[in-house]
Amino acid sequence: MTERNGGFPGDYCFEAPGGDYDEGSDSPRVSEGSNCSKRKVGETFGVSKMVLPLSGLSSSDRKELIRRLRQELEQIRVFQKNFELSRTVALTSSSASGLTRVKSFGMSRCSTGPGKTVNPISAASKPTPVTTAVMLLMKQCEALLKRLMSHQYGWVFNTPVDVVKLNILDYFNVIEHPMDLGTVKNKLTSGTYSCPSEFAADVRLTFSNAMTYNPPGNDVYVMADTLRKFFEVRWKTLEKKLSGTKVHTEPSNLDAHKEKHIVIPVPMAKKRKTTAVDCENVVDPAKRVMTDEDRLKLGKDLESLTEFPAQLINFLRDHNSNEGGIGDDEIEIDINDLSDHALFQLRDLLDEHLREIQNKKSSVEPCEIELLHGSVPGNSSMQHCDGSELDDEVVDIGENEHPTSSISPVTIEKDLVLGNSNGNSLGSVSGDPKMSSLPRASKGLGTIDLEPMLDGATSASPTRGSSVGGLDQLESASPEKISSVEADCQQDGNSAQNEKQLPPEKSYRAAILKNRFADIILKAREKPLNQNDTRDPEKLQREREELELQKKKEKARLQAEAKAAEEARRKAEAQAAAEAAAEAKRKLELEREAARQALMEMEQSVELNENAKFLEDLELLKTVDTDHLTNTIEEEDGPDVGLRSFSFGGSNPLEQLGLFMKQDEDEEEADPLTSPAPEIDIEEGEID
């Protein structure tokens, strides 16, 4: 009985009595030195056919057979890979007509002279023209395959099934067409697939084989089902793109089928090579293709966004393939699933959003600059600072604003650089800063809205062109608003009263700030005058003289305010220091008094405790039983104890201790009177 395994290359057949044959390997091998007398050699379609009796082979011959067959299989695979590679190169290198004829395997046996019909095998193997869209889809299929193979369950399906290692000898009886992701990758890289549909069919076959052989609930079944769903969700996007390309590919397929039985003369074929032009080859190269680096950069830019605009969210929802696994507040999208056209649209939307963010950041963001501990007031344009003075300034965003203050603080952009260690003035500005101000509501006082560039006449930094001065804008915009310099001059008393209401530290900061930027304010107003060269020179000269006079007055007033604020601050600091010293002294006296009271209470408690102890000892001596006490002392301490010499005898124990009651003098005087008279010896017979 001979059996034939169609899965073996070379069309080998072998005898297996009773249907038993070696399934120890995926592909049997033949050894060159094996002595098989029953070997039969035939030929089918030009391929040799041999029948090998497995029952008559020894173990060494079988091993040699396996080795030989594996070697031949490897040679066939290498040949197939080279053939497919040459076909792919021939397809992509055709530039005249876009139609390339490739000789199939064994085609040299057929002749295609004039009047000869084309061999159906060679006609069927003639490839259809591959367009740019199909090539891009195949690249996306390759990316999807990489994701499948790198999945946590992909390792099970990355290699062919080893029936010997897994001990599943009946696998090829159940599964007629084995397939794995590794084989799919090899076929994809070698160009075997002519369209993405063939790729999808092999991927589905891989998972369906695993689900067919393994029962539901098995680990491999669950893994295959998970990967199948993973693939189907992402294949929907590619399938939509593929449906658009089928319109162009189907006519070429029909022409290929018609050419199977058509007589093709050689001269006509040469004419087609030189004259035929494929319209798709002209249109497709114009399409933009996004590279992998651009895709990666696009993904990083999307991840870096904290807020998404509405148009970007709508675009992502429209192109989202995972419709079932998302919520209202979450969108999951794969960059590799999107087409190049969609990716470029997404890139444009993202660039537009980033430009809007950059414009917002580059716009004027005013912030107040306050001075904690300013230096001596003076001309800011002549003051130079070192690195230590930079610590005296802080930026106040407006949280500690004075609600009723008439002071108009000058605000500067956040990117303003205030001085440096090279000796630039704190009043000067490096680069091209713009001056602006926060609109504040104050009684009868306008604010400064300056946006001119500072030139280098007063400060040490270079400047560029500037706009119209803010004071002129205020005068033209509203007649009720006046310049800050004139308002300060006219309302000196009001500002002084308001500053008195402020804390000394706040007043000092405001005065130093105004004094520091006085030159900048006046210079900003003077610059528009220098730009208006078309005006009357005499009028310009008068305005300059007025500005110089106002500048001198303003400087004098600001210096006086700064000095007054400095003096007030010093007085406040001295008063606060005196109050702090007095408070510390008072606290020290209170602590000392509390310590003395605690010491006295402690001494009194100690004396009372000692007197109570003495009284308890005396009471014990008065109430103790002398006989019992002496007996216990003799038993415990022995005869050498000093207390044994005391004989209590029933007398007062205090007298035994040497304590006696002292009698008063009155009692001593009364003793002779009460004492009995001395006895007189009376002789017998004598009458008294």
From Swiss-Prot:
Q: Where is this region: Transcription activation domain?
A: 505-688
Residues that bear Phosphoserine = 478
Residue ranges constituting the NET domain according to the UniProt record? 280-361
Coiled-coil portions: 534-613
Composition-biased stretches, type Polar residues, lie in 491-500
Which parts of this chain are annotated as the region Disordered? 1-36, 423-505, 660-688
Where is this protein chiefly located?
A: nucleus
Superkingdom, natural source: Eukaryota
Q: Which UniProt keywords apply?
A: Activator, Bromodomain, Coiled coil, Nucleus, Phosphoprotein, Transcription, Transcription regulation
Q: Give a yes or no for keyword Coiled coil in this entry.
A: yes
Tell where it localizes.
Nucleus
The record ties this protein, via Gene3D superfamilies, to: 1.20.1270.220, Bromodomain-like (1.20.920.10)
Concerning CDD domains, the annotation shows: Bromo_plant1
The segment(s) forming the Bromo domain are: 132-238
Nucleus in keyword set: yes
Q: Which InterPro entries match?
A: Bromodomain (IPR001487), Bromodomain-like_sf (IPR036427), Env_Response_Regulator (IPR052442), GTE_bromo (IPR037377), NET_dom (IPR027353), NET_sf (IPR038336)
Instruction: List, alphabetically, the GO terms of the cellular component aspect.
Output: nucleus
Question: One of this protein's Pfam families, by short name?
Answer: Bromodomain
Assembly information from the UniProt record: Interacts with BT1.
PANTHER family, per database record: TRANSCRIPTION FACTOR GTE11-RELATED, TRANSCRIPTION FACTOR GTE8
Record's protein name: Transcription factor GTE9
As recorded in Swiss-Prot or TrEMBL, the protein's gene is named: GTE9
